[in-house]
Structures are given as C-alpha cells and as structure tokens.
Design a protein with these regions (language model features):
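Catalytic core of nucleotide-activated saccharide and alditol-phosphate transferases
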Residues: 36-124
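N-terminal pre-catalytic "stem/leader" segment of glycosyltransferase-like enzymes
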Residues: 1-53, 68
C-alpha cells in the first residue's frame, strides 16, 4: 500500500526524506513524500500546516504542549492524556536508540573506585 505524506513546521534540521516517521512507516507501507499528501505530519515550528485542508493532519510534538484537536485529526505527543484513538503518547526519549537503552554499558567497579573523583553536597 502506498502512502503519500508530507512534513511541515518541523525544526530546521529535520529531514523530510530520512526521519523516524519514514523509518517506522516504510516497514509496512511504500512511502512517497508529496506536496499533495494524504497525510500531513506537522509540528510546532510554523503555520504552514494551515494551508492544507484536504488531508489527514497529524500533529507531532516532543515538548510538553497539549494538542489542539480543532486543528488536527490526530496527535502524537508528550502529554499524559487520553483522547480516544486520536492521541498517542510518544515521549521524545522513545525515539532514541532502543538497543542502546536496552543493553546498558557494564561498568567495571575498579574503574569507578580508582578515578580520583571528589564530590561535596552542601546544604544551608
């Protein structure tokens, strides 16, 4: 199945052709980034999303900002809230390397003890 999607109003370094949405969706769908999308994924860094009316709008935010469901059909965000099937909580840290998080680095106790580190905790 082919999905036509577009990304607008993301941070300046966001790559619309190589990102976590493309990585996830391309496992099941044939993805085409298009100026005439069926699905628009947008964020908080602009107002270009207001120019799109004939597509499904999905709001994505990694910050603690509550989605306005008058402006979007679905939302993916940080807030701990429920809005039926229209909202999915996806904290920003989930997008980090899962393998690296699942297999923490093993720390050698000898290395920790022999690093000549000193710390003070002061309270008045």
């Amino acid at each position: 199945m082919k999905l036509k999607i577009n990304f607008v109003d993301f941070w300046p370094s966001f790559d619309s052709r190589c990102n976590f949405f493309i990585d996830i969706l391309s496992k099941k769908y044939d993805i085409e980034v298009s100026d005439d999308p069926d699905y628009l994924i947008y964020s908080i860094f602009g107002y270009e999303n207001l120019q799109y009316d004939s597509c499904v709008k999905i709001f994505y935010v990694g910050e603690n900002i509550t989605p306005d469901f008058n402006l979007c059909d679905y939302a993916i965000g940080f807030d701990l809230m429920e809005f039926g099937d229209r909202y999915m909580r996806l904290p920003y840290y989930v997008l980090y390397d899962i393998e690296k998080l699942a297999t923490p680095e093993i720390i050698d106790p000898e290395t920790v003890l022999n690093r000549k580190f000193c710390s003070f905790v002061v309270s008045n």
